[in-house]
Each structure stands twice: as C-alpha cells, then as structure tokens.
C-alpha cells in the first residue's frame, strides 16, 4: 500500500506538467499503471481473474 502522503502529493497539480504521473486507483502503486483501466498490473490481474472488469479475458493461443 502506498503512503497516504504520496497519494495526496500525486493528486495535487504539479508545477510543471511533465511531472504528473499516474497511480493505481485501488492500491496507489505508481509503476506499471494501465491508463485505459487506471489500475496497476497487480490489481488488473486480480480483478480480471475475478471477473470484475467487463470485457477483459485471459489470452490463450
């Protein structure tokens, strides 16, 4: 779980636009966040396997 202070800091508008970064909506993780879902890879995999994300299916080929 991310620190609450870091989550609050990320929500503020930065002085320079290039300093803005995404965080996971569920756990607050700053790395490997998928923009389409707003979730990190860990939460995306967990919620996807539980069937909580409509239209998301596990790939097999």
UniProtKB/Swiss-Prot annotation:
Q: Which domain of life is it from?
A: Bacteria
Single Gene Ontology MF annotation: rRNA binding
What keyword terms does UniProt attach to this protein? Metal-binding, Ribonucleoprotein, Ribosomal protein, RNA-binding, rRNA-binding, Zinc
Q: Which InterPro entries match?
A: Ribosomal_uS14 (IPR001209), Ribosomal_uS14_bact (IPR023053), Ribosomal_uS14_CS (IPR018271), Ribosomal_uS14_sf (IPR043140)
Q: Which Pfam families match?
A: Ribosomal_S14
Q: A biological process (GO) annotation for this entry? A: translation
Instruction: Give Gene Ontology CC terms.
Output: cytoplasm; small ribosomal subunit
Please verify whether the record's keywords include Acyltransferase.
no
List cystine links. none
Q: How is the cofactor bound?
A: Binds 1 zinc ion per subunit.
| Residues that bind Zn(2+) | 24, 27, 40, 43
Q: Cross-referenced Gene3D superfamilies, in alphabetical order?
A: 30s Ribosomal Protein S14, Chain N
In terms of PROSITE patterns, this protein maps to: RIBOSOMAL_S14
Q: Which cofactor does it need?
A: Zn(2+)
Q: Which HAMAP family match?
A: Ribosomal_uS14_2_B
Describe the subunit structure: Part of the 30S ribosomal subunit. Contacts proteins S3 and S10.
> Which family does the record assign?
Belongs to the universal ribosomal protein uS14 family. Zinc-binding uS14 subfamily.
Described purpose of this protein according to its UniProt entry: Binds 16S rRNA, required for the assembly of 30S particles and may also be responsible for determining the conformation of the 16S rRNA at the A site.
Q: What is this protein called?
A: Small ribosomal subunit protein uS14
The organism's taxonomic lineage, starting at the top: Bacteria, Pseudomonadati, Campylobacterota, Epsilonproteobacteria, Campylobacterales
Tell me what gene encodes this. rpsZ
């Amino acid at each position: 779980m991310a620190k609450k202070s870091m989550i609050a800091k990320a929500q503020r508008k930065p002085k320079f636009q290039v300093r803005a970064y995404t965080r996971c909506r569920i756990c607050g993780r700053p790395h490997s966040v998928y923009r389409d879902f707003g979730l990190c890879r860990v939460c995306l995999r967990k919620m996807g396997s539980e069937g909580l994300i409509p239209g998301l299916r596990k790939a097999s080929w």
